[in-house]
């Protein structure tokens, strides 16, 4: 979403 790790969810 905001950062690549957050977009994984």
Curated annotation (Swiss-Prot):
Alphabetized, the UniProt keywords read: Cell wall, Secreted
Q: Where in the cell is it found?
A: Secreted, Cell wall
GO cellular component labels: extracellular region
Q: Which domain of life is it from?
A: Eukaryota
Q: What is its main location?
A: secreted
Q: What name does UniProt use for this protein?
A: 70 kDa cell wall protein
| UniProt source species | Nicotiana tabacum (Common tobacco)
- Give the organism's phylogenetic lineage: Eukaryota, Viridiplantae, Streptophyta, Embryophyta, Tracheophyta
């Amino acid at each position: 979403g905001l950062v690549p790790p957050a977009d994984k969810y």
